[in-house]
A protein has these predicted regions:
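Short glycine-enriched nucleophile-adjacent loop
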Residues: 186-198
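Active-site machinery of serine-nucleophile hydrolases
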Residues: 94-160
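The feature captures the conserved acid-bearing segment of alpha/beta-hydrolase catalytic domains
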Residues: 198-287
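Catalytic active-site module of serine/aspartate enzymes centered on a nucleophile-bearing elbow/loop
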Residues: 284-302
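Gly/Ser-rich "nucleophile elbow"/oxyanion-hole loop immediately N-terminal to the catalytic nucleophile
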Residues: 78-82, 142-183
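The conserved beta1-alpha1 loop
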Residues: 89-93
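Short, solvent-exposed loop/turn and secondary-structure capping segments
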Residues: 83-85, 98-104, 137-142, 190-192, ...
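A domain-start/cap signature at the N-terminus of enzymes
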Residues: 25-87, 124, 220, 254, ...
Length: 302
């Protein structure tokens, strides 16, 4: 009896140790912190005046010039008038946000970092779009629209008009427009980017980082799985490079598999524990792979 009791206690201890080791590898603190890797990029300071090579400026589409709405535009360091460039369009995460790792998100377009990390400041026009309030008069930092309706219509309208406007005025190639986003912005890649047939036509490829439309039910209308599937059906084979901190990308992989929708999906863990798009301001194997993936698409897209 004592032998059986000791054996059970040993098994329990072994299970506890095994569970702890498993948690170390797949838990929220499993991967290294971004602070362990030195940055090789720094966001350009926000400047006033007209857009030009290497400048990061606030702008407003002319249709909204009597409102508080604005977006951010960065023209690549090697930008020249009359030349053509692929475009990275980005949506920010919710804000204000801060976690126990010190990861922060303001929720404003100027807090976005993905596009600059992906481009390194060269070769791509980088456009950070806003989410608009229910009345279309200002930017919002949580979801889109206002509680409880979270009406996306003004957000959609601004994107539909601003992306072609930026391409027309600054040499963006309308056939090579990437859509990326962090957290809320990751969800927005599909929720906003594939919301209807008109906006879905704007993009050549997608890079959602941390969360994915349909995986989890959120507080805004239309976050249910069936609605997300109807949006995903508008993807129509275009490639997506889906990333997440730690092992969270598996939730996206499993949900997409369950939908039965086939496509050109790439799934990668970022290699960091952080819920923070600043990981792309640091060198990493995944950032290198994402850049190569984008370059290949720009070469094959007509």
């Amino acid at each position: 009896v004592e032998s059986q009791k000791a054996s059970k206690e040993m098994s329990a201890r072994s299970l506890a140790i095994a569970s702890h080791i498993f948690a170390l590898f797949v838990g929220t603190d499993a991967a290294p912190d971004i602070k362990s890797v030195k940055t090789d990029l720094k966001l350009p300071a926000l400047q006033t005046g007209e857009a030009n090579a290497g400048k990061r400026v606030k702008q407003t589409h002319p249709n909204w010039d009597t409102t508080e709405v604005y977006h951010l535009l960065h023209l690549p360091n090697n930008w020249k008038p009359g030349a053509s460039y692929p475009v990275i369009v980005e949506y920010a995460g919710n804000g204000p946000y801060k976690n126990h790792h010190g990861d922060k998100s303001s929720g404003h377009p100027e807090g976005s970092k993905m596009g600059y990390g992906l481009s390194g400041g060269n070769d791509y026009i980088w456009l950070c779009l806003p989410y608009l309030s229910d009345n279309g008069q200002k930017n919002v930092t949580r979801w889109w629209g206002n509680q409880p309706s979270h009406d996306p219509s003004h957000t959609l309208d601004y994107a539909k008009k601003t992306v072609p406007w930026v391409c027309e005025n600054f040499g963006g190639d309308t056939e090579k427009v990437f859509l990326c986003g962090f957290s809320r912005g990751s969800i927005a890649c599909n929720f906003i980017g594939l919301h209807d047939d008109e906006i879905a036509k704007l993009w050549c490829a997608f890079l959602p980082y941390s969360h994915y439309d349909g995986v989890k039910r959120w507080s805004y209308p239309g976050s249910d799985s069936q609605s997300a599937i109807s949006r995903l059906n508008r993807l129509k084979g275009r490639p997506q490079f889906i990333t997440h901190e730690n092992n969270g990308v598996e939730n996206s992989r499993n949900w997409i598999k369950e939908t039965g929708i086939e496509g050109d999906f790439t799934f990668r863990a970022t290699g960091f524990r952080n819920h923070n798009d600043a990981w792309l301001l640091r060198p990493s194997p995944v950032r290198k792979e994402m850049r190569a993936w984008m370059k290949k698409i720009t070469k094959t897209t007509n």
